[in-house]
Every structure is written in structure tokens, then in C-alpha cells.
Amino acid sequence: MLSLQILAIVALVVAAIIAIVVWSIVFIEYRKILRQRKIDRLIDRIREREEDSGNESEGDQEELAALERGHLAPWDVDDL
């Protein structure tokens, strides 16, 4: 009976060690996934800003080109 108790204690210790190792691996992988999500969000934000800045500058230039501008000089120009 004593050997059965020793075997049970050894089995519990081995099971506890295996559980600790498995949960450690799970925790490490979870941190990797979180880090990758942060990187993906940053990349998405950079792409959005890149698209926004590119579109705004082209759009502004097109809008400015479409505007009818008068004389650029602030003084009275009489060139008729």
C-alpha cells in the first residue's frame, strides 16, 4: 500500500510539472499573438494615414486648380 501512495504522489508531481510547462507555453504563445495584433494595428494605422495623406494632397491640388483665381497681387492691377 505504501508503494501505491508513493506512486500516486509521484504521478501528481509529474502531472503538475506537465501542467506548468503546458500553461507556460500557452502564455508565451498568447503574448506573441497580442504582440502581433499590436503590430498589425500599427501597420493598419500607417496605411490609413498614408492613404489619407496621399488622397488629401492630390484632392487639394485638384480643388485648387479648379478654382478661378483673380490677380495674385494685393495692390490694384489695371492691365485691361
Curated annotation (Swiss-Prot):
Q: What is its main location?
A: host cell
Give the Extracellular membrane side ranges.
1-7
- Which Gene Ontology terms of cellular component type are present? host cell membrane; membrane
Sorted alphabetically, the keyword list is: AIDS, Apoptosis, Host membrane, Host-virus interaction, Inhibition of host innate immune response by virus, Inhibition of host tetherin by virus, Ion channel, Ion transport, Membrane, Phosphoprotein, Transmembrane, Transmembrane helix, Transport, Viral immunoevasion
Chain intervals for the UniProt region annotation (Disordered)? 49-80
Pfam families from the UniProt entry: Vpu (PF00558)
According to the UniProt record, list the residues that bear Phosphoserine. S53, S57
Tell me the GO BP annotations in alphabetical order.
receptor catabolic process; symbiont-mediated suppression of host innate immune response; symbiont-mediated suppression of host type I interferon-mediated signaling pathway; symbiont-mediated-mediated suppression of host tetherin activity; viral release from host cell
**How would you summarize the oligomeric state and partners of this protein?**
Homopentamer. Interacts with host CD4 and BRTC; these interactions induce proteasomal degradation of CD4. Interacts with host BST2; this interaction leads to the degradation of host BST2. Interacts with host FBXW11. Interacts with host AP1M1; this interaction plays a role in the mistrafficking and subsequent degradation of host BST2. Interacts with host RANBP2; this interaction allows Vpu to down-regulate host BLM sumoylation.
Question: Miscellaneous notes for this chain?
Answer: HIV-1 lineages are divided in three main groups, M (for Major), O (for Outlier), and N (for New, or Non-M, Non-O). The vast majority of strains found worldwide belong to the group M. Group O seems to be endemic to and largely confined to Cameroon and neighboring countries in West Central Africa, where these viruses represent a small minority of HIV-1 strains. The group N is represented by a limited number of isolates from Cameroonian persons. The group M is further subdivided in 9 clades or subtypes (A to D, F to H, J and K).
> What's the protein called, per UniProt?
Protein Vpu
Q: Which gene encodes it?
A: vpu
